Amino acid sequence: MAIRGKSYIKTSWAFQERPVSSAKFNTWDDRIEAALELLMNLASLAWGGGDGVIRNASAGDLAVSARTPPGMAVSVAPGYAFIGRFPFRLSASTMVGGIASPVSHPRIDLVQARLDTWDVTVKQGTEATSPSAPEPDDDCLALAELYLRPGMTAVLDSDDGVNGYITDVRTYV
């Protein structure tokens, strides 16, 4: 298992090259990588060992909410999580746009935190008379489901019967 995500310093080297060609340095570097991986695994186990948001680690805990004024975008509050036993951090409130209303039937989209890029994306679901949410991608953590209706003009925090609304699906460690 290799260390993934932005929490690992080695990702700053574009092609995983090492600055020194010494075999001794390369062995030392591999031991540092193993130690960092062990440290991340132990930290994950200390928080419960699963994937999820770390409760009360920051003001927002990766909560998804409607924008002010409401529109076809949502905001995700900063927070910390573990995804695949690796730390994830969203340092500032982030606006996630690109949400399009369905054409003929309701649809459920998934707001997910992505480990490899430390950002938040929306995974589009499939339109259906009785829609279901898509599964999170690999190395992603589900934060919220967006129930979207045909002809809607905004995503709200609660159901008003006309527009789309947000359902919190965060899990905590």
Regions found by a protein language model. Give the residues of each.
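Beta-strand-rich solenoidal segments
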Residues: 2-173
